[in-house]
Each structure stands twice: as structure tokens, then as C-alpha cells.
């Protein structure tokens, strides 16, 4: 399964985010946690994200994986760290095991890719498609990932375009935002948005997109910054092509909602239907 989120501002108010629980493939700040756990493939984990440091001084964790114990013995967690000289490190259980050749510069967005294989015992880090470090002495435990964390409360850097998977992910894969038009739904002036209190009302997104600037689509997600359920319409059914999910709309102060679909080849036939 592939889990994605492109939208940094969702994370600005909640500090360190550790994901657990199982909801859907969107990474969101309102507690929609996920488990990156598949009994067949959870031993080989990959994540990618874009990072920009906003200060000349770092000494910060950025992201990494937690693993299940094996035969009642703890397995070292794997994290990426940028030290006070701005070099990226691989850390196991809070200890530096490899300082990479890569030095981060302020004000530049970098595409970071982390590959952890507990069967092969390898940890590989790429930045902008280039391998910058490989640790080959990670214990071959065969442990499965139980969850992961992005450190998002730092004053010193920003993260966006986060992808986590226990399946296929290439080092040049990233998230791109696209605009769509909306059909089959009326604008509510009083609500300043598209809204309904009736079951079965639809929002249809157009057009179909199969390639974006030469990139092939492998997964897709749709998110709202301001979605709110009601007593009459607590949920929506979201369909994309042949796939669909029922998503419960948030209430109260939490207005983020969305759904993600792995293994899709196009953005097409996207319909949001109000549901009970």
C-alpha cells in the first residue's frame, strides 16, 4: 500500500506526528493514522519526501520507521537526521551509524528517498536521485514495520510531498498537484462552498488525466482543507475509476478530509457522493 500527502500546512499545528491505527491512505493532521503493515511485504519499507531547511543551523531528526520486536527482542528503529554541520546521518536507536556525504544547504528543496530492508539488512539514502549513503550492517532480523514518523514541529525545516509504502516506489517518484473542474453540484453562497443536506448528491471532477508533464500516474489522492459532516450527511463515498472508499467527514474543529487510491493509472471518473 502507498500512503501520500502533499500538503504541508496540514501539519503546522500538531508537532511530531507518529502514525498508528488504520484508516485510509491519506496522511493527515487530524489523527487519520495508518499502519504501514503488510504481513508479506512489511519488511521492505520505502519513504520519500521533499525537505527544505530554513535555518543555517540544524541538529534535527526528520523522518523514519519503527519496527516490531522479533522473538521478544527489540529491533532498532531507523531514522534520518541532519547534524549540526548540516550533514545527513542514518541513525539506529538514536545513535549515528553512518554520516552520509550529503550536506544540506539552506533555502533549497531536496527530494529525499529512504529504503530500509530488514531481510537484506540494508539502509540506503538517496537525495535528488543520487545515492548519498548506504549502511550494510543493519541486523537481518526480517522485522516488519509497525509505524513511522515525520518530525514536523521543527522551526528549522519544512517537509512536503510525503510518500510511504511497503510496495513499489521509485527514487524519482513524487507528488504533483493538479487542478480539476467541478460539475453536477451547486455552489452554496451562504456556506461559501459546495454543500448539501441530501443523501445521494454528487460532485463530479473533470477531466481525465493519464500523464502529467511526462510523469506516469501510480497513485492518486484528493483532499479538502475545509470539509465538515452534518447529522444528515456524516459521510461521503469517493470513487475513482473502478475503486471507491467511504470516508466519514470530520466534525468540530477538524476539517481535513480526503481519500487516496494506490495502483491507479489515471485520474478519471472521480465522483464524491453524499452518504449516510
Kindly give the residue locations of the regions a language model identified.
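Short, tryptophan-glycine- and acidic/Ser/Thr-enriched carbohydrate-recognition patches
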Residues: 1-17
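Short carbohydrate-recognition loop motifs
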Residues: 15-33, 86-87, 190-198, 245
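Secretory/extracellular carbohydrate-interaction modules
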Residues: 28-88
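Short, aromatic/His-centered strand-loop micro-motif at the edge of beta-sheets
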Residues: 90-111
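Extracellular beta-strand elements of beta-rich domains used
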Residues: 112, 160-167, 174
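Flexible glycan-contacting loops in extracellular carbohydrate-active proteins
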Residues: 135-161
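Disulfide-rich extracellular domains of secreted proteins
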Residues: 167-276
Amino acid at each position: 500500500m502507498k500512503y501520500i500527502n502533499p500538503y504541508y500546512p496540514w501539519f503546522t499545528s500538531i508537532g511530531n506526528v507518529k502514525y498508528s491505527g488504520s484508516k485510509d491512505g491519506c496522511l493527515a493532521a487530524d489523527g487519520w493514522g495508518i499502519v504501514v503493515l503488510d504481513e508479506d511485504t512489511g519488511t521492505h519499507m520505502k519513504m520519500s519526501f521533499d525537505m527544505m531547511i530554513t535555518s543555517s543551523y540544524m541538529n534535527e531528526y526528520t523522518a523514519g520507521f519503527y519496527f516490531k520486536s522479533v522473538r521478544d527482542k527489540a529491533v532498532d528503529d531507523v531514522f534520518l537526521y541532519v547534524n549540526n554541520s548540516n550533514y545527513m546521518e542514518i541513525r539506529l536507536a538514536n545513535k549515528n551509524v553512518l554520516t552520509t556525504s550529503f550536506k544540506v544547504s539552506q533555502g533549497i528543496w531536496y527530494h529525499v528517498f529512504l529504503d530500509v530492508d530488514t531481510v537484506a539488512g540494508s539502509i540506503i539514502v538517496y537525495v535528488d536521485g543520487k545515492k548519498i549513503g548506504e549502511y550494510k550492517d543493519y541486523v537481518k532480523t526480517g522485522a516488519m514495520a509497525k509505524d513511522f514518523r515525520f518530525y514536523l514541529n521543527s522551526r528549522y525545516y519544512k517537509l512536503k510531498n510525503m510518500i510511504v509504502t511497503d510496495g513499489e516506489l521509485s527514487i524519482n517518484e513524487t507528488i504533483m498537484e493538479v487542478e480539476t473542474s467541478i460539475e453536477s453540484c451547486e455552489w452554496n453562497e451562504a456556506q461559501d462552498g459546495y454543500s448539501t443536506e441530501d443523501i445521494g448528491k454528487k460532485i463530479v471532477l473533470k477531466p481525465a488525466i493519464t500523464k502529467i508533464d511526462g510523469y506516469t500516474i501510480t497513485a492518486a489522492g484528493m483532499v479538502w482543507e475545509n470539509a465538515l459532516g452534518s447529522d444528515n450527511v456524516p459521510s461521503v463515498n469517493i470513487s475513482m475509476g473502478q475503486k471507491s472508499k467511504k470516508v466519514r467527514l470530520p466534525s468540530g474543529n477538524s476539517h481535513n478530509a480526503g481519500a487516496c487510491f494506490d495502483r491507479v493509472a489515471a485520474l478519471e471518473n472521480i465522483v464524491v457522493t453524499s452518504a449516510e
